[in-house]
């Protein structure tokens, strides 16, 4: 991470120098986004345990990337305990605690790598740690923690005094309760800076010493800012997985929403409530099929996309569930797995490829429907990330399936741009976030409008998707699948 930080910042400065009149001395702030929840064990000096030669080769001492689901047992136990004793802890995260989140990973480390856990003085979210390194923070107690990570992933809320109380944590494991004293008491929104650039890192990066460092947030949350998010906008950052974000005014009363990853005041923009949802695998599913199963690469991706674009909805009578890495929203179950129904002796690779794209679109529709069901205003959808940039077929299918016009972020690096917006506001280059967003963000001219005929076809196909989704997902324990395959054949041969 630190090598990548140096390389990317110096590379950005080198590119910027090609602009007439630019000088690094003009840079007034820096912002950082990362994946999350990605907790990192650190020592008393706020140094990553992985940098200690003793632990360098121990994977448990590395950053626990969000995608790791090995803490699913711990997550289930956290959910069960909270449901019995502290239901408010999980009410704002869909009533289910995820294996992708903070406490699940740290507890799993304690259970499976106790020596690493014992060696770690504290734990810091990657999104908080990198800004703290830039600021030269020499102890975990000095790290400015962001409400984005704390509120969405660590069951933090001012309403109950911050992190879960020690009584609750001790019921999980007394060592977690003891750790709480070495974590943090307060988390902040983007209105608070993480610090100022220290001399060492100013020299390493080639930036002015003392410039402001924006508070750390997760990639999709800063990506939402980089897409110009306002109330009524759903931002989808589509990559290996997809994460969705929306904001509503802090004055609006939003009920608890089952299956949603988090409803957290200040998590994206100060003065707004941040709402997060998502899908655990999207681009990774396409990569699995094209590269893992078909043995191809970029050329095959392109060829299958061209072939799939010529096919109608539900081509070949196929229907898939997009659960290859579990389901994040709305079922919050990492143990669910993928499924494709409707194979025949005539099924082609392109038909399967299209069915996988359609499955992720159906997953996206289920999220949009859940948000609207609970009163979240959604008037427009803005997509960012590599897939939104590169795959018009997927974007059109998403428009047809959801019935929403799909806009595309103006920047190919919307998450980094959102980080820069935050830094610009904190540095005083813009007076507030709305002003900075108007000046620094835009959408591309291209947009994907729903095709009415295909929309009708997808409505019928989505009904079959929900039959499988609700049955295998445990929402409908009396689900009848006896007509699914015949219905799929009928839909593919109208």
Residues covered by each model-derived region:
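Activation-segment/catalytic-loop signature of the eukaryotic protein kinase fold
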Residues: 311-413
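Glycine-rich phosphate-binding/hydrolytic loop that grips phosphoryl groups
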Residues: 76, 222-226, 275, 279-280, ...
